[in-house]
């Protein structure tokens, strides 16, 4: 299939590995609608505060590669892959502001995609910061 799986974890430099892949012209796919650990960034998502990972937005900011939000939505004929408009993370006076604005754009994109059928979206991890 041509898929390379990169497993992250403590002691591994996953960010640099992914950065190198992007710079060399490879596409990467990252789970971006939830932070699987508690180090995410708070962002408004469906009128609640959720924890999103900063990594995808930080990679885009560092490499200049756009983010293309996607979602798999179940239809009567099977699953359909939907692409939202690609976007570049905006440059602001500091990285934290750029990351926050990029995450807001990402969360808005996911809201539009998931609103096609919110019943298809699920998580077994806490998403909303109020759940922590």
Give the label of every model feature segment:
Residues 1-11:
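Membrane-interfacial amphipathic helices and adjacent loop/beta segments
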Residues 12-132:
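Non-catalytic C-terminal accessory region of glycerolipid acyltransferases
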């Amino acid at each position: 299939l041509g898929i390379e799986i990169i497993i992250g974890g403590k002691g591994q430099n996953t960010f640099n590995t992914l950065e190198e892949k992007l710079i060399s012209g490879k596409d990467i796919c990252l789970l971006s609608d939830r932070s699987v650990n508690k180090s995410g960034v708070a962002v408004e998502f469906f009128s609640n505060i959720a924890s999103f990972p900063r990594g995808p937005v930080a990679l885009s900011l560092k490499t200049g590669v756009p983010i293309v939000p996607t979602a798999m939505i179940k239809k009567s004929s099977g699953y359909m892959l939907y692409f939202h408009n690609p976007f570049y993370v905006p440059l602001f006076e500091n990285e934290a502001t750029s990351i926050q604005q990029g995450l807001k754009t990402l969360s808005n994109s996911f809201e539009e995609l998931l609103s096609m059928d919110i019943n298809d979206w699920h998580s077994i991890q806490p998403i909303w910061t109020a759940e922590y």
